[in-house]
Amino acid sequence: MEVLESGEQGVLQWDRKLSELSEPGDGEALMYHTHFSELLDEFSQNVLGQLLNDPFLSEKSVSMEVEPSPTSPAPLIQAEHSYSLCEEPRAQSPFTHITTSDSFNDDEVESEKWYLSTDFPSTSIKTEPVTDEPPPGLVPSVTLTITAISTPLEKEEPPLEMNTGVDSSCQTIIPKIKLEPHEVDQFLNFSPKEAPVDHLHLPPTPPSSHGSDSEGSLSPNPRLHPFSLPQTHSPSRAAPRAPSALSSSPLLTAPHKLQGSGPLVLTEEEKRTLIAEGYPIPTKLPLSKSEEKALKKIRRKIKNKISAQESRRKKKEYMDSLEKKVESCSTENLELRKKVEVLENTNRTLLQQLQKLQTLVMGKVSRTCKLAGTQTGTCLMVVVLCFAVAFGSFFQGYGPYPSATKMALPSQHSLQEPYTASVVRSRNLLIYEEHSPPEESSSPGSAGELGGWDRGSSLLRVSGLESRPDVDLPHFIISNETSLEKSVLLELQQHLVSAKLEGNETLKVVELDRRVNTTF
């Protein structure tokens, strides 16, 4: 619902649904001129204009759209305190920021808007002739408050409950209106259950959006204050806030001290802020409406100041920690760079030493390989030579022999033959004489010797030994090699035989044969 202002007179026109709830005549019976007028007389025109013209109070219209939470309990609101459930008509009062909460429904929001639209014309009674409008304005407020008690979550029943509120007598409501200061004190006194939630949204809360300075925050319901801001502005930042940061703060008065009646002792910070803002310092309880608004305003400012200091402190701590981390990282980086340089230098030296060792090892290995190659070559040659000598000596008796061995073997065989083998040669010479008989002019000694040779030849024939021709004589070798004379005599014999056979010198050959036989 919207509240429309007239151009000059400031007369507020209400929505048709709210204006039709009751008749103007019925509202006068429920109007409480004495007590409500006393509250309105406490406001000066300047203070009211200052609150209405506050520039940063025009941003709260969105925060009033919060839906009620079904889990929250129903507010225990008295019928005569309907002004505490009212909402600002498009952000005209700083006290309207705490009116919405989880338990609000659309009917309560409508009642708040309607009440504020009647509240300000009532303040204009002092200077303007419009004085009959406030009484009919209070009738719907009373009935709407009763509907909040009976059915807080239904929208169809307010007209039915409104009629019951109209029929109610004034005697039952007047004593409850006199309890207004106590209810206002209950609003200022944040219960322990409310305080943590209220503190959660203080740091991100701008000065114009906090609910402690609004005119519609006069409700005795403490649940309406905490959740008005976090649900619209920064619900994600509400969790990490300290719940007991402001309740235990020495800058604010304890909530339980604002209840009841008696002397009121404020903190130095609250007094200083009140003086700076130009408000009078309250000294006794219960508080009036103006004192309540002023106190809420300065408490909001103090809370904002505390939250700002806390955020700055945390930011400073965070920056200090970051600076320390940067310093530690930079020092560690320098140390690591130095270590890297040292390791690089050692690596270079190790590489140089490794290269030197490799060159030395390669030189030594090449020399040893060469020496080993020459040694193995000589060893192989010696081994081959030894094998050649060994196998050569082994195969001498079976393989081809030199001339000396050829001459030695027949001589060994000839030694085993009887003496007649040599006689055969000489007898062959005698047989050779038969073809050409010698002259008989030889001496008788020689004839006797020839007879001996004839007997030797006859024996040879008897034994079956055949004579060999003279051609074989050069190939026949005397077996006795013990003396050089034997070989020489054999060669001379062969030459002489060949020469004397031609010259008929057989006698000399016979003599040579005899000499040879005697040597054997």
Swiss-Prot record:
The lineage of its organism: Eukaryota, Metazoa, Chordata, Craniata, Vertebrata. Residues 336-357 are annotated as: Leucine-zipper. Keywords: Activator, Chromosomal rearrangement, Developmental protein, DNA-binding, Endoplasmic reticulum, Glycoprotein, Isopeptide bond, Membrane, Nucleus, Phosphoprotein, Proto-oncogene, Signal-anchor, Transcription, Transcription regulation, Transmembrane, Transmembrane helix, Ubl conjugation, Unfolded protein response. This is Cyclic AMP-responsive element-binding protein 3-like protein 2. There is a cross-link at residue 178 (Glycyl lysine isopeptide (Lys-Gly) (interchain with G-Cter in SUMO2)). It comes from Homo sapiens (Human). Its main location: endoplasmic reticulum. It is found in: Endoplasmic reticulum membrane. Glycans are attached at residues 480, 504, 517.
